[in-house]
């Protein structure tokens, strides 16, 4: 399939099979007409949704909204929309005509099982850097400014090193977010960028919200093809007020954990091992304690990979005819019962959370700014190479340590000691931003037509009460306030839903 071409399947056409590339550098988006008499598909969601053959306004599904509330993501191939699907890592869609109607048969096969690695394969550090550079440079569009989202992490620094060794320092600017506190990566990023010969620019949190930022927020949600529940979603409208990203090349380091080893923390690994057997108690616990430790102790194995949200008890109060996401994740646990946890985590977090929460936010941003998004780690050649390497080069099961070869390369080449530095996760104070525009946030939530207006007010106030009382889980309640806002503001203002 050619990239960004809008394809059409009509009734009685020959059966076709739709797949994405191996690591979903280019997911395929499908629209099935309401009468099931034609089907459109493309690697460009913007091209698909902007087509005159797609009936608008688009209709959302109660099931999709239910998943966003409870889990933060809609399981693929489904989306929050009726009749729009995503074919991503491991998905296949067979399209055929049956009784004068178009039918889609979806199937799933995870392509990155660790048992399929080649134990005899050897590592080639030069090939790794050259392939990463090629995956980036081949996608750069000339006469566009180019930006690399850069941090102190292994993924973006591997790309930066590869580009530097290929002589592309003068064509790319490294950008990093200056976070508050001891998790700020921008100083390290700036130092490495200078060492490698790149220009560097810091992105800052606002001290107050001005009209420019509010306009950028409105523009973002009005034009975002999909909702994204990522905690740093609001950072992107902020970035757009500091750099003009319109029509640029955007390079990001996401997308490699699925095939390079999706390694959990030791705490997560132990909790899923010991506690996931108790998930059958969930229906009872949900009636008593929707957000406390007892609720967490009844997580399914799927949910231990990073899925959490508003309880079904509260979801059913604010959303009429809501769907209980727990039943779906319970079935996934059964279907993948023979996966060890590293394969299981890669098959679920890697293909769903990483794709449709983390990467989706920057895909949205690229579509909104008409930018050329480049995800070098998802390149077919890169993914094929790493997916066949022996585990010993990539991760340590006993120590739960990831990306061993990248740690080695970066330490030897640029002196970046990831072991000494430790985990420095990207930090963005989304709740401070929400509180700067609290009246606006509350109005978007309280007057959203998705919700029961009496119950949503009770729920929102209960979250604020827990936050203001410094509840031990106040960080989680802040996340849930943000989730209500992200869904509500998208539903209220999005041009595809409100056309």
Residue ranges and their predicted role:
Residues 1-204, 208:
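Cysteine-centered catalytic environments shared across enzyme families
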Residues 22-26, 45-48, 154-156, 181-182, ...:
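Short, solvent-exposed loop/turn segments at secondary-structure junctions
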Residues 84, 304-499:
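Adenosyl-5′-phosphate
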Residues 186-222, 249-254, 325:
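A conserved beta-strand->alpha-helix junction
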Residues 237-317, 361-382:
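Active-site adenylate/phosphate-handling loop in enzymes that bind or generate adenylated species
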């Amino acid at each position: 399939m050619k990239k960004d071409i809008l394809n059409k399947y009509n009734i009685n056409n020959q059966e076709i099979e739709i797949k994405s590339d191996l690591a979903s550098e280019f997911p395929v988006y499908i629209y099935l007409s309401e009468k099931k008499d034609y089907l459109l598909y493309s690697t460009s969601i913007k091209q698909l949704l902007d087509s005159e053959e797609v009936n608008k306004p688009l209709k959302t599904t109660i099931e999709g909204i239910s998943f966003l509330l409870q889990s933060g993501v809609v399981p693929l191939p489904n989306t929050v929309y009726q009749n729009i699907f995503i074919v991503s890592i491991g998905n296949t869609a067979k399209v055929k005509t049956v009784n004068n109607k178009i039918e889609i048969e979806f199937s799933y096969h995870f392509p990155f099982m660790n048992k399929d690695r080649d134990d005899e394969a050897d590592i080639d550090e030069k090939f790794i850097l050259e392939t990463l550079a090629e995956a980036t440079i081949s996608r750069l569009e000339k006469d566009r400014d180019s930006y690399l989202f850069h941090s102190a992490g292994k993924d973006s620094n591997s790309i930066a090193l590869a580009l530097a060794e290929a002589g592309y320092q003068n064509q790319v600017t490294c950008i990093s977010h200056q976070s508050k506190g001891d998790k700020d990566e921008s100083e390290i990023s700036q130092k490495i960028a200078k060492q490698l010969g790149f220009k560097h620019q810091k992105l800052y949190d606002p001290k107050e919200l001005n009209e420019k930022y509010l306009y950028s927020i409105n523009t973002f949600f009005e034009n975002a093809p999909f909702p994204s529940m990522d905690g740093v979603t609001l950072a992107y409208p902020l970035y757009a007020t500091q750099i003009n990203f319109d029509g640029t090349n955007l390079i990001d380091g996401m997308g490699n954990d699925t095939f390079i080893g999706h390694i959990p923390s030791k705490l997560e690994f132990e909790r899923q091992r010991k506690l996931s057997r108790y998930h059958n108690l969930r229906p009872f616990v949900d009636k008593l304690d929707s957000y406390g430790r007892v609720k967490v102790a009844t997580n399914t194995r799927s949910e231990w990979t990073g899925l959490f949200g508003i309880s079904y008890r509260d979801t059913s109060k604010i959303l009429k005819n809501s769907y209980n996401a727990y039943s779906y994740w319970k079935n996934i646990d059964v279907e993948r019962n023979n996966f060890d946890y590293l394969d299981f985590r890669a098959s679920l977090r890697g293909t769903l959370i990483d794709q449709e929460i983390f990467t989706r936010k920057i895909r949205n941003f690229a579509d909104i700014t008409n930018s050329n998004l480049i995800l070098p780690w998802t390149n077919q050649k890169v993914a094929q190479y790493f997916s066949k390497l022996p585990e010993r080069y990539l991760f340590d099961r006993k120590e739960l340590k990831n990306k061993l070869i990248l740690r080695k390369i970066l330490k030897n080449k640029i002196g970046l000691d990831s072991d000494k530095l430790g985990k420095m996760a990207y930090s963005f104070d989304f709740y401070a931003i929400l509180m700067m525009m609290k009246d606006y946030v509350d109005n978007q939530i309280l007057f959203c037509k998705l919700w029961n207006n009496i119950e949503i007010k009770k729920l929102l106030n209960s979250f604020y009460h827990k936050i203001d009382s410094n509840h031990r889980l106040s960080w989680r309640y802040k996340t849930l306030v943000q989730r209500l806002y992200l869904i509500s503001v998208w539903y209220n203002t999005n041009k595809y839903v409100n056309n």
